[in-house]
From Swiss-Prot:
Negative regulator of class I heat shock genes (grpE-dnaK-dnaJ and groELS operons). Prevents heat-shock induction of these operons. The keyword Repressor applies. Keywords: Repressor, Stress response, Transcription, Transcription regulation. InterPro entries: GAF-like_dom_sf, HrcA, HrcA_C, WH-like_DNA-bd_sf, WH_DNA-bd_sf. GO terms for molecular function: DNA binding. This is Heat-inducible transcription repressor HrcA. Belongs to the HrcA family. The lineage of its organism: Bacteria, Pseudomonadati, Pseudomonadota, Alphaproteobacteria, Sphingomonadales. One of its GO terms (biological process) is negative regulation of DNA-templated transcription. It comes from Sphingopyxis alaskensis (strain DSM 13593 / LMG 18877 / RB2256) (Sphingomonas alaskensis).
Length: 347
């Protein structure tokens, strides 16, 4: 049966579903009808509750583990709860103070990012993650210097004053004026742009046939920018803190999942790709279980938010990873506040 939108559930079904999710997120254990019937907020018999829970199971919102008569939310159920029922409040004054204190210790920005990640890990009881900003410098000047009939030296000057020299192959018989034309075009037209922005503008200009240089110079411009983009230093760095939080008492019955998660955190590449995908949004993103396709863990969730530099561009992502039974209502605003605090620090 297709999972219905929250508005199509009856009031009784919504009440039972909310209580099951709340109890599961608190204890990590399946919830039985007798337990729910004892709650003062739910004036239903165990039999009535069982019928409602059966309906919710048929909708794909609840599941019954083989070892228990109780039920727990599925990944689809958690998604429905997070998107349609969760009530998010501001982080507590104590949480805010601890996050801000972690950022006030001074030192290099990487140290502040690591401290904020450790604080977030401690407050959330998850592993804290931060994607350190890519060093995406801006272009200032580019020159193409002939070296031989088949090679040219590309001199790349960045806005921060760093200079890089790269050698590229050129067609035999290339007119030297094409080298001058390509360098002048980049310095005059693309100066002040990041590499990504410069490459995008060149593509647009070529596709629209607005670029005011000949074909040979166009090829040099594209290849000169591509040489710079191949620099491995531009790859983001992932900092992980608090992996031990994933090995608490509640993980004893799920050691295979935890072991696999720790392996993923050790290699970092798939997690970094997942966090990098959160750069595209403007708000906190929640990836529940297997709905993220970048790594294979079905029992883990990631909450991540982008943070920005002085120019307003997204420069990195901060977040947490833990079991799907996270306290989403508390952790989502906590991650969001950390991202905002990092943005203020970097500016």
């Amino acid at each position: 049966m297709t999972t219905p939108p929250i508005t199509e559930l009856t009031t009784r079904a919504r009440d039972v579903f909310r209580l099951v999710v709340d109890a599961y997120l608190e204890t990590g254990q399946p919830v039985g009808s007798r337990t729910l019937s004892k709650l003062a907020t739910l004036n239903l018999s165990p039999a009535s509750i069982r019928n409602v829970m059966q309906d919710l199971e048929e909708y794909g919102l609840l599941a019954s583990p083989h070892t228990s008569a109780g039920r727990m939310p599925t990944e689809q159920g958690l998604r429905l709860f997070v998107d349609g029922m969760m009530q998010v409040a501001e982080p507590s004054a104590e949480d805010r103070a601890q996050i801000e204190a972690s950022l006030s210790e001074g030192g290099p920005i990487e140290s502040a990012l690591a401290q904020a990640t450790a604080a977030l890990s401690g407050l959330s009881a998850c592993a804290g993650l931060v994607l350190v900003p890519k060093h995406e410098r801006v272009l200032k000047q580019v020159a193409f210097v002939p070296m031989s009939e088949r090679q040219a030296l590309v001199v790349l000057v960045a806005g921060d004053g760093t200079v890089e020299n790269r050698i590229i192959d050129v067609p035999a018989g290339l007119d030297p004026s094409a080298l001058v034309e390509a360098g002048n075009f980049i310095s005059a037209t693309l100066s002040g742009l990041t590499l990504t922005e410069a490459m995008a503008r060149v593509r647009r200009e070529i596709e629209a046939e607005r670029i005011a240089i000949d074909r040979a110079a166009q090829d040099l411009v594209s290849r000169g920018l591509a040489i710079w983009s191949s620099d491995g230093a531009d790859r983001p760095v992932l900092i992980v803190r608090g992996q031990a939080n994933l090995l608490d008492d509640s993980a004893v019955g799920d050691l295979d999942r935890v072991r696999q998660l720790l392996d993923e955190l050790e290699t970092k590449q798939d997690i970094a790709q997942l966090l990098d995908s959160a750069r595209e949004g403007s708000a906190t993103r929640i990836f529940i279980g297997s709905e993220n396709k970048l790594f294979s863990l079905s029992g883990s969730s990631v909450i991540a938010a982008p943070y920005r530099g002085a120019d307003g561009r997204v420069v990195g992502v901060v977040g947490v990873i833990g079991p799907t039974r996270l306290n989403y209502a508390r952790i989502v605003p906590m991650v969001d506040f950390t991202a905002q605090s990092l943005s203020r620090l970097i500016r």
